[in-house]
Amino acid sequence: MSMTDPIADLLVRIKNAAAVGKQTVKLPSSKIKVAIAQVLKDEGYITDLRVTATENNKSELEIVLKYFEGRPVIETLKRFSRSGLRQYRGKTELPKVLGGLGIAIISTSKGIMTDAQAREAGVGGEVLCFVA
């Protein structure tokens, strides 16, 4: 099965699983999905992530969602740059999500990082998504 936008697929799977109260999300793995999930883990939005090998030399990403008092920690998860319209921002134009309460995940020349880390590193890049 061909997937047009694997990042959007990752975000929708996380959002849907959180909406129905599932503990884990399993999906096909890729380097960019693992990097985005690692940023979410580092920022405290998910509990854990695991990459496991499956048959036919494929790998599967399992994300353990985080809940606080029965509600998902991730309230908003929105794709910003999309396959039909890429959104690039310079280091001075990086967005602040909810006045700094959320994060924007940025793909830079130095890897995938949050908007705050990109500002600190002095790099801009493609704004992948917003998380709050």
Swiss-Prot record:
Top-level taxon of the source organism: Bacteria
| InterPro entries cross-referenced by the UniProt entry | Ribosomal_uS8 (IPR000630), Ribosomal_uS8_CS (IPR047863), Ribosomal_uS8_sf (IPR035987)
> What GO MF terms are annotated?
rRNA binding; structural constituent of ribosome
Keywords, A to Z?
A: Ribonucleoprotein, Ribosomal protein, RNA-binding, rRNA-binding
Q: Name one GO biological process term.
A: translation
Q: Give yes or no: UniProt keyword Lipoprotein.
A: no
Q: Where are the transmembrane segments?
A: none
| UniProt xrefs under Pfam families | Ribosomal_S8
Q: GO terms for CC?
A: ribonucleoprotein complex; ribosome
**Record-linked HAMAP family:** Ribosomal_uS8_B
NCBIfam families (alphabetical): PRK00136.1
Describe its partners and assembly state.
Answer: Part of the 30S ribosomal subunit. Contacts proteins S5 and S12.
Question: What family is it from?
Answer: Belongs to the universal ribosomal protein uS8 family.
Q: What does this protein do?
A: One of the primary rRNA binding proteins, it binds directly to 16S rRNA central domain where it helps coordinate assembly of the platform of the 30S subunit.
Provide the protein name: Small ribosomal subunit protein uS8
* Recorded name of the encoding gene: rpsH
